[in-house]
């Protein structure tokens, strides 16, 4: 996005957002509010889209679901109007992740497909890689392993043409880790081995902590299926010792959930509860009932395994209450999606109409006013 046309104050706000988005949430949110307010005053969809997007990104990192959904849906509308396609695709990606977490894979897939379409239309290969990897994870969640592999492999093929991109190594780890997990879940353990070896190649210790923990989770599942108790438990302890108190819960929930399912089959109860104690408050804070239900299901499995009947019944009662509330949430989510799609469709129709009108005017300007013949030969 280019911002040279704006005054010094606006450019300073934008610079502050981009420089601090990973380190200072309060400062970024304050600048985003200023940018949105100025954008409203000047009827500037580009500024409003920018402010809503980066504000939404911060709320995503803070696990603040209510503000995230509002900001990101607003961002999508304004960015589409401003024709800022890279951020439009990133909006679709965020909303796809959130919809999947809410338990609506069909809606998530719709967001991802729109993101893929715009990635192809506007030649955005790195954004396409991002969408393809998350589509692969969606298929993985749904047990569509062939589709999952194909999506990951398509992302890999594009990635090989972008080896100098700053995100190349990040996406390579995502590809190898997710492919390994996909193969492991199908019990194709020998095929998964070379992917795991890549993840542990020289220098992997320099990978970000969250990514190292993801690799440890894949190792836990792999060694559990291999029956290697010692290596499995070593990986479990790595997670237990290094798990931070705060995670971006939507980015990692499915991985930790699958890890917990493995832990329920072991005697590693302390590590199981360590993970639950970290993810549960963040899931509650994000206000995604579907994930709260999954956490409760882990607790119920544990209580049943250890014959803790009173705790099991209490959790079951809460599970029932949340299930009823989740139905209303799903209806509201679909209603919001329908409204958003109508708004985007209306804007795109208006844009196409304007483009056709401009084309007609251009053709007329290129014709002799007397003969109506083209002046260009």
What are these model-predicted stretches?
Residues 10-14, 18:
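Short terminal alpha-helical segments
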Residues 1, 17-31, 36-43, 48-359:
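Regulatory sensory/coupling modules that transmit signals to nucleotide-handling catalytic cores
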């Amino acid at each position: 996005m280019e911002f040279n046309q704006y005054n010094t104050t606006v450019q300073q706000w934008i610079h502050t957002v981009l420089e601090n988005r990973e380190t200072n949430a309060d400062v970024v949110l304050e600048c985003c509010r200023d940018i949105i307010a100025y954008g409203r005053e000047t009827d500037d969809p580009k500024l409003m889209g920018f402010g809503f997007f980066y504000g939404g990104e911060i709320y995503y990192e803070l696990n603040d679901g209510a503000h995230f959904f509002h900001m990101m849906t607003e961002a999508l509308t304004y960015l589409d109007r401003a024709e800022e396609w890279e951020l439009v695709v990133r909006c679709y990606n965020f909303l796809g992740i959130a919809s999947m977490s809410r338990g609506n894979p069909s809606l998530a897939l719709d967001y991802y497909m729109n993101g893929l379409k715009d990635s192809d239309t506007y030649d955005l290969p790195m954004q396409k890689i991002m969408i393809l990897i998350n589509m692969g994870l969606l298929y993985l969640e749904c047990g569509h392993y062939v589709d999952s592999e194909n999506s990951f492999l398509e992302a890999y093929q594009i990635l090989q043409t972008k080896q100098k991109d700053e995100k190349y190594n990040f996406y390579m780890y995502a590809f190898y880790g997710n492919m390994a997990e996909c193969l492991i879940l199908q019990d194709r353990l020998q095929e998964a081995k070379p992917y795991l070896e890549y993840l542990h190649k020289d220098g992997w210790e320099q990978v970000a902590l969250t990514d190292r923990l993801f690799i440890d989770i894949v190792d836990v599942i792999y060694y559990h299926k291999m029956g290697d108790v010692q290596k499995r438990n070593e990986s479990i302890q790595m997670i237990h010792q290094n798990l931070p108190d705060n995670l971006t819960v939507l980015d990692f929930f499915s991985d930790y959930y699958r890890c917990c399912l493995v832990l329920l089959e072991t005697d590693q109860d302390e590590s199981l509860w360590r993970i639950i104690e970290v993810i549960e408050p963040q899931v509650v804070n994000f206000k995604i009932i579907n994930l709260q239900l999954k956490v409760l299901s882990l607790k119920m499995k544990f209580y049943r395994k250890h014959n803790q009947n009173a705790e099991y019944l209490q959790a079951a009662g809460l599970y029932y209450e949340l299930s009823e509330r989740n139905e209303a949430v799903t209806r509201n989510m679909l209603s919001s999606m329908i409204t958003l799609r109508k708004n985007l469709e209306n804007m795109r129709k208006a844009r196409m109409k304007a483009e056709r009108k401009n084309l007609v005017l251009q053709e007329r300007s290129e014709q002799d006013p007397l003969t109506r013949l083209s002046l260009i030969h």
